[in-house]
């Protein structure tokens, strides 16, 4: 019986390693598309921030309008109404709501970046894209506003990975310039993952 358990454990380990190897091979084939799709830049120009105001991602916080504790699944960038909003990675527009309350988000854009990533841009004043449209990193997709359940002009930005909201701050380097980011991405594209 002990030998069968050991063989079973070995078979499971080999299976997991083969799945991981298959994923690595697929990643290698798709690395350029992945590097362009993963949300990785600031959704607004940092110089547009009011007093460097960035509201935190939080599992629980006091909602400023509703007055009770609930999750805050994104981060908020305090800025003037009309500030340009950029796609943070290559994607297809899944939702572009140019009117309505939309569950408190107001006017919003939801981008599908593939590879399990989506990003949401909410409380917009103006939506500049349409569902089904392909957008590229750095493209202006909207302008900030104060629509929906909001206390003032800002951008609410979410990163959703495999259906779960994750902290967007982990997806961009606050000190990295666009040029530095492009150099990093170029180095990643030149890396041969098949030899790792």
Description of each model-found segment:
Residues 46-194:
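Catalytic cores of peptidoglycan-degrading enzymes
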